[in-house]
């Protein structure tokens, strides 16, 4: 079982921003236009409100686990301790693979984004990718606080941009800026507020569900939180409300200023010049809007990559502690208490992927598309672990109030809502392919699940693991001092 002897240098301020930074990225700044175009302003807002409810209960469940067992292994360690070590092995390597690809792709895209400015074209894209990777690696090897501070300020840039955007948008809607009063007329233009029927809404709901992926990284930071029983619940509450408000209010502003029928909203090229944020700033009269949004997108990508390097290295370290990865990956530096070996291995693998992408970029991006959606499996494993934890408390005749530092509200209703939502996201991701009769897409969506099941059962067969009995689950609170 992971003991986690790392330096606990992250406080509530860091943890809140790390989670916010994980969920706010190019999906908000670039993709929201197509969401509004597909489902209309009402459909888009409703979709994010529904996903917001799921996110609240999901993060509450993760918070309950993270405060009771605050280790960097998070989802791998929860499954190992409360369910089955084979499930922990599978979830650990899955989450590691997801973030490894996300990190690599974000760094690769960053090198393309910086090419927006002619001034930075003196290096090739691959050179910029290596420079970005080297900078992020250096930020992670000195102290966990350096990582936390970097992530705090990178995320703060995104948050500040959104707040300024919402404020300028509201002033534009009521006619103070931009020389025109927009009001709420675009909410009822054409077929608005709800467009595209049930299929349009369900499609947007899927986009909304996957767009909040990354918020769960907050669980990994629990292993280096200075006071997880205090900082984790606080961060989770703040993250839910801030992410919900940022997404919903941004969509509300965009919908009021740009009608859903505007072809620019589709932004099929995913160009920064056609980002809904850029369009709104342009209509207000901010000439350098595209440069501003491009800079924010660049910081978003680097912020996500920074979190990715942190997350992948901590997963390797924790799995090594749980004897689910090579032992040498579990070494800590005596001075900094950082898993430098795991960090260096992460650096080498990401560098290798970046180089491979120069010759076979389609393979890297296809892999990310295939396994990236499997983050919902990781979310589901945390719900299963929470249910097992609560069941063990009941089985051992203990009081949840005395065992748990933080209790997720509305249990068991919360986990039930999350399970229903996750089932929908999983089924909905393939239902379009079924209706269209596209077997290749269906196979692409289902094959990762089959591979995961094979990994789980092969590990179970080789290691002869068993599901932990409820009466045998260790319910002693983790001593993080």
Tell where the protein language model's regions lie, with residue ranges.
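TM-loop-TM module centered on a large, flexible mid-protein loop between adjacent transmembrane helices
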Residues: 77, 84, 116-120, 188-191, ...
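Helix-loop-helix connectors at the membrane interface of multi-pass transporters/channels
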Residues: 1-3, 76-82, 86, 107-129, ...
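Extracellular loop-to-transmembrane helix junctions
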Residues: 6-7, 12, 20, 31-129, ...
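Hydrophobic alpha-helical segments and their helix-loop junctions in multi-pass secondary transporters
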Residues: 157-189, 253-261, 379-397, 427-434, ...
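Membrane-interface loop-to-helix entry segments
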Residues: 125-182, 236-240, 244, 368-381, ...
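Membrane-interface "cap" regions at the ends of multi-pass membrane proteins
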Residues: 1-33, 37-42, 55-60, 72, ...
